[in-house]
């Protein structure tokens, strides 16, 4: 297989049944980019020697320096299946176009994974066979299943089991089994009815084993072919015996289920005897330098070494031999082609999850059928910087229709509502580009089922959006598993450079799916990210790429808190409008546990049918059904984890002031009364309203501030407190380092929740909760206390209530409130109730 020209690529793009859109996902350092190299080698893009070392899809200098992937990178390649028996039934010919996206594994960049999953139909999940399924494996797999993306698995770093841990073959089998079982537990936990059962099993060919660094991999299919040809038996029968409790009794010449021979001798299971043993024997012969032994094995395997290769020894020779015998690229590409769906298959069950409009309209039908003649529907999931500073390719997937260079299209942002003109422009597409890792190639048009980059769209979209050619609903915006909770204020050393900073922040906001850039009312310029590393990368980009190297001053990182209440308002709160002609009576209640999380997870949404919503709230949280039907608003921003409920009866003119009251509620929830942080987990009941009969006296200018003040009064009478964000830290270390972990955790208000040894390894898995505000410098601190043996990975987990009185400056929560108020330039001390609560 050679590098394929753009012209040939176009022909493949039309053959929808033979396209595979897939991404590589895993925990950090489990070997995604290294494995991707094996696939890229097959496409003839890098040489065989460089595979596993080049990390071709790590295109940025900082990715090569840090040895981690920061941005997801797309590459298209072509593969032909040689064995006609293996071609899938719905395929059209034996040539396949594979659009692969390599994604980051570090939790701080998991928004990049979400963007990659949105435009793909399948995912290759990489699991380190020593470390097993880790916290980020769980996160990315959950995201994949939420997007209805079908997973297949590769158990990576198998060479470590043989060379480092020197495990017995049976132990290795049990270790692989545990990892596969853990993946299947996650798949069944987050399963989706429409996606169907996507559990993985080596016997079905959906699990491979290999080593990305050494460039080899195999599925059981490979050995089934080899042994069935040798013994002259049916390939499928052989395949069934290579996994599970199947033991070959050579004397009796039959398979047993119990591992004991007729005379009580211990039998080896099929996987060990026919798959793992040959590999282990070859490994040992080469590493121990037993030339006669391994040359005999190579002859049996029909592997011919070149004169140069014969000179090699040890690991170098091992790599060469294994790449020739079990090339990872071929194994993985076959697995991708055979077990991942084409756009034609996948879009049938993915459309209902993606399209926001009715499922029987023209756009939805075209998406479900992947119809290139239907209306254009494309989702832009991220922006990729071009060589032209400050400009971006809009990268996305065409779900129906065909997008053409120079064609007119409607570019709609995530807030577009059909029938309205906001957040939508009609413009020409300047160019369509094939994204090829480090390079791009212009192309005239791109039919549905493919991923593509667009030039000239970046001016009209911030981060993501939908591109159509007719009036249609938009494709649902992405939901990220992390939130930007760590932020810094940025300013320029030289005030005259301020316009460059503002422009740079706009560009940074575009380039990163998650990064938030905004200006506070106090005039501070804020950049917010998911964690310390994410923020560091964003700030480096901001200074070097988007602000032309302007010197910047960056404050210490600050963490976002949330305000809440801990008990119902002790009195009914009354606020009057400025003209004293209107009165609002409200009361606040804290959410029952779990409701805020349900709202954020989308279990109940503002657009859910009100009867369904009421049923859910009454059954799960014991709400009164009538009250649950009268939810006016979720806040802030009409979608947050707070609710405004109308419990009044028969109030005249109430509908006329509804918008103003909702507006006031949203304002109050966005900037809380305690320290201007967002409010979370509060339900506000509107209990009574007295309105002036004349509409001119109850306009927005009167009612919005009145509603806001009343909400604040309710919060102040409900024992207000703060919620701080907590990380779930997963730390892998040997037993000797556990003491150091406890020391660091206790110093940082952390709480260890579990520690367990990974069976068959000397490693311990320690899980702990760590406050985000205590996490700065945590990794360096931990490494210095454990002599560099502990590797932490922190994922945002939940919001934790801080105990104490917010008005008492000597308590922990009081001192945090005082510090936040001082930083924001607010008056000292929490405002008193008399500022918001009016007397009758």
UniProtKB/Swiss-Prot annotation:
Where does this polypeptide localize? Cytoplasm
* EC identifiers of the protein: 3.6.5.-
Gene Ontology cellular-component terms for this entry are: cytosol; ribonucleoprotein complex
* Catalytic activity from the UniProt record: GTP + H2O = GDP + phosphate + H(+)
Q: Where does GTP bind?
A: 26-33, 156-159, 211-213
Q: List the disulfide bonds.
A: none
Q: Does the keyword Transport apply?
A: no
Where the record annotates domain tr-type G, the positions are 17-251
Keyword annotations from UniProtKB, A to Z: Cytoplasm, Elongation factor, GTP-binding, Hydrolase, Nucleotide-binding, Phosphoprotein, Protein biosynthesis
Coiled-coil stretches noted in the UniProt entry, renumbered to this chain: none
CDD domains of this UniProt entry?
A: aeEF2_snRNP_like_IV (cd01681), eEF2_snRNP_like_C (cd04096), EF2 (cd01885), EF2_II (cd16268), EF2_snRNP_III (cd16261)
Catalytic class of the enzyme: hydrolase
Positions of modified residues (Phosphothreonine): 57, 59
Q: What is its main location?
A: cytoplasm
Q: Briefly, what is this protein's role? A: Catalyzes the GTP-dependent ribosomal translocation step during translation elongation. During this step, the ribosome changes from the pre-translocational (PRE) to the post-translocational (POST) state as the newly formed A-site-bound peptidyl-tRNA and P-site-bound deacylated tRNA move to the P and E sites, respectively. Catalyzes the coordinated movement of the two tRNA molecules, the mRNA and conformational changes in the ribosome.
Q: Which PANTHER family match?
A: EUKARYOTIC TRANSLATION ELONGATION FACTOR 2, TRANSLATION ELONGATION FACTOR-RELATED
Family indicated by similarity: Belongs to the TRAFAC class translation factor GTPase superfamily. Classic translation factor GTPase family. EF-G/EF-2 subfamily.
Protein name according to UniProt: Elongation factor 2
Natural source organism: Entamoeba histolytica
Q: Which gene encodes it?
A: EF-2
């Amino acid at each position: 297989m050679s590098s394929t020209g753009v012209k040939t690529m176009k022909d493949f793009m039309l053959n929808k049944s033979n396209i595979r859109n897939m991404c590589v996902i895993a925990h950090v350092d489990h070997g995604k980019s290294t494995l991707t190299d094996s696939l890229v080698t097959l496409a003839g893009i890098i040489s065989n020697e460089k595979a596993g070392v080049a990390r071709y899809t790590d295109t940025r200098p900082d990715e090569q320096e840090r040895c981690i992937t920061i941005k997801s990178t797309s590459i298209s390649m072509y593969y032909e299946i040689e064995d006609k028996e293996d071609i899938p039934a719905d395929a059209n010919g034996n040539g396949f176009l594979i659009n692969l996206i390599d994604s980051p594994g570090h939790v701080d960049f998991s928004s990049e994974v979400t963007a990659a999953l949105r435009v793909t139909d399948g995912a290759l999940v990489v699991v380190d066979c020593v470390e097993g399924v880790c916290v980020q494996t769980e996160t990315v797999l959950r995201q994949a299943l939420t997007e209805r993306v079908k997973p297949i698995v590769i158990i990576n770093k198998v060479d470590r089991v043989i060379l480092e841990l020197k495990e017995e073959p049976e132990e290795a089998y049990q270790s692989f089994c545990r990892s596969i079982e853990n993946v299947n537990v996650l798949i069944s936990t987050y399963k989706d009815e429409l996606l169907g059962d996507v559990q993985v099993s080596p016997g079905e060919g959906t699990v491979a084993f290999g080593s990305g660094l050494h460039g080899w991999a195999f599925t059981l299919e490979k050995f089934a072919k080899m042994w069935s040809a040798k013994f002259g038996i049916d390939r499928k029968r052989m395949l069934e015996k290579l996994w599970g409790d199947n033991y070959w009794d050579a004397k009796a010449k039959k398979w047993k289920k119990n591992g004991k021979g007729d005379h009580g001798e211990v039998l080896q299971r099929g996987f060990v005897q026919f798959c793992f043993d040959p590999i282990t024997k070859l490994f040992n012969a080469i590493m121990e330098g037993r030339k006669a032994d391994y040359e005999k094995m190579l002859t049996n395997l029909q592997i011919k070494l070149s004169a140069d290769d014969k000179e090699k020894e040890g690991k170098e020779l091992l790599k060469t031999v294994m790449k020739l015998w079990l090339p990872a690229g071929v194994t993985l590409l076959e697995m991708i082609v055979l077990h991942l769906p084409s756009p034609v298959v996948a879009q049938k069950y993915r459309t209902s999850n993606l399209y926001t409009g009715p499922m029987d309209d023209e756009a939805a039908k075209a998406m479900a059928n992947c119809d290139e003649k239907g209306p254009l529907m494309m989702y832009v999931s991220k922006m990729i910087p071009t060589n032209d500073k400050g400009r971006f390719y809009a990268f996305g997937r065409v779900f129906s229709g065909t997008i053409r260079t120079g064609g007119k299209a409607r570019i709609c942002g995530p807030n577009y509502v059909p029938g309205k003109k906001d957040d939508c422009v009609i413009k020409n597409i300047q160019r369509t580009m094939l994204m090829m890792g480090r390079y791009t190639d212009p192309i005239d048009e791109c039919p549905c089922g493919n991923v593509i980059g667009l030039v000239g769209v970046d001016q009209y979209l911030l981060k993501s959006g939908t591109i159509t050619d007719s009036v249609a609903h938009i494709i649902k915006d992405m939901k990220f598993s992390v939130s930007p909770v760590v932020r810094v204020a940025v300013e320029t050393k030289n005030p005259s450079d301020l316009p460059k900073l503002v422009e740079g922040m706009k560009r940074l906001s575009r380039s990163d799916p998650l990064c938030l850039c905004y200006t506070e009312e106090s005039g501070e310029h804020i950049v917010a990210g998911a964690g310390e590393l994410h923020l560091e990368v964003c700030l480096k980009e901001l200074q070097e790429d988007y602000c032309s190297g302007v010197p910047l001053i960056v404050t210490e990182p600050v963490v976002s808190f949330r305000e809440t209440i801990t008990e119902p308002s002790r009195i009914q709160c009354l606020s009057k409008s400025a003209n004293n002609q209107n009165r609002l009576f409200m009361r606040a209640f804290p959410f029952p546990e779990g409701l805020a999380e349900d709202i954020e997870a989308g279990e109940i949404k503002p657009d859910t049918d009100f009867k369904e919503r009421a049923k859910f709230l009454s059954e799960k949280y014991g709400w009164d059904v009538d009250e649950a039907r009268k939810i006016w608003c979720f806040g802030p921003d009409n979608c947050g984890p707070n609710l405004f409920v109308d419990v009044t009866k028969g109030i005249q003119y109430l509908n006329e002031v509804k918008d103003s009251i909702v507006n006031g509620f949203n304002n109050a929830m966005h900037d809380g009364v305690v320290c201007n942080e967002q409010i979370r987990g509060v339900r506000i009941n509107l209990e009574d309203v007295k309105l002036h009969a004349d509409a001119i006296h109850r306009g927005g200018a009167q009612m919005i501030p009145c509603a806001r003040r009343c909400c604040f009064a309710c919060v102040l009478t409900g024992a207000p407190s703060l919620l701080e964000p907590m990380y779930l830290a997963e730390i892998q270390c040997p037993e000797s380092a556990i003491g150091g972990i406890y020391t660091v955790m206790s110093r940082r208000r952390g709480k260890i929740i579990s520690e367990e040894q990974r069976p068959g390894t000397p490693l311990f898995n320690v899980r702990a909760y760590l406050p985000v505000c205590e996490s700065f410098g945590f990794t360096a601190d931990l490494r210095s206390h454990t002599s560099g043996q502990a590797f932490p990975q922190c994922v945002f987990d939940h919001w934790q209530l801080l105990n104490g009185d917010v008005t008492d400056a000597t308590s922990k929560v009081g001192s945090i409130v005082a510090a936040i108020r001082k930083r924001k330039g607010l008056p000292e001390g929490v405002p008193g109730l008399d500022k918001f609560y009016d007397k009758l």
